[in-house]
Amino acid sequence: MERLLGDIPVELGVDFKKAVKEIPAQSGEGTVFEMNGNTFEKVLYTGMIDEFFDDCYGPLEYRSLRFESEELPDVDNFQGNAVVNYTERDVPFTRIIEHKFFEFGKDSETGEPVRGTIITREYPATWEKGMEPYYPVNNDQNNAIYEKYHALALEKKNVLFGGRLGLYKYFDMDKVIRASLDAAAEELGK
C-alpha cells in the first residue's frame, strides 16, 4: 500500500464536512477546497452523496452490517476458503470470513502453518445515522431522491463522486475498480 500511495498524504477517520472547506478560488471563478492550509481544485468524494449536500432533499436509505468474530483454537481449517457466501433464507448471516486464508495460513515469522483459526460472520443490519453505511437501498423512492442529488452533483464541476455511496449504486468490487479506473482515465483525458 505504501508504494501504491507514494507521497500522497492520507488521513483516516476524518469527517470530510468538518475538515474540508469550500472557498472562493483566487481567480474569482468558481471554488476550491481547503484542508490543513492546502488548496485543491478538485476532490474525489466517496462518502454519502446526500450527506455531501446536507440532506437537502432528505436522507437516502442504506443497509449496514454487523460482524461477530470467533477464535477457534482447536480448528485449523473451518471452511477451506477465505470467504464463503450464504444465500439461504434461513441462515442469518451473509458470509463467513476465515482470515488465515488471506495470508495462506502461515506464520509471517516462521513460515509454519498457523494453529487454530479465526472466523468472522457478517450479518445484515438496519442502518441508522452514525453507523457505517455499506450498501444503498435502491428502490423507487430512494432512486427518485438520488436523481435530485445526482443533478446537484453534475453542477459541482470540481467534485468527482464515486463508489457505492457517492454514486448511490451497488457495485461488486471488480466493477467499482473498473468504474474508478474509467473515471480516472476520463478525468485525466486518457
Give names to the regions the model predicted.
Residues 2:
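Active-site phosphate/pyrophosphate- and oxyanion-stabilizing loops and adjacent acidic/basic residues
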Residues 5-20:
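A conserved beta-strand/loop element that lines the FAD pocket in flavoprotein oxidoreductases
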Residues 8, 40-41, 156:
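Short, well-ordered alpha-helix to beta-strand connector turns
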Residues 11-15, 99, 162:
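Conserved beta-strand termini and adjacent loop/short-helix elements that scaffold enzyme active sites
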Residues 21-152:
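Mid-domain catalytic core of redox enzymes
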Residues 57, 171-174:
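Short, solvent-exposed loop/turn segments at secondary-structure boundaries
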Residues 153-169, 176-180:
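Short FAD-binding loop at a beta-strand-to-alpha-helix junction that anchors the flavin cofactor
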Residues 177-190:
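Internal hydrophobic alpha-helix adjacent to the cofactor/substrate pocket in enzyme cavities
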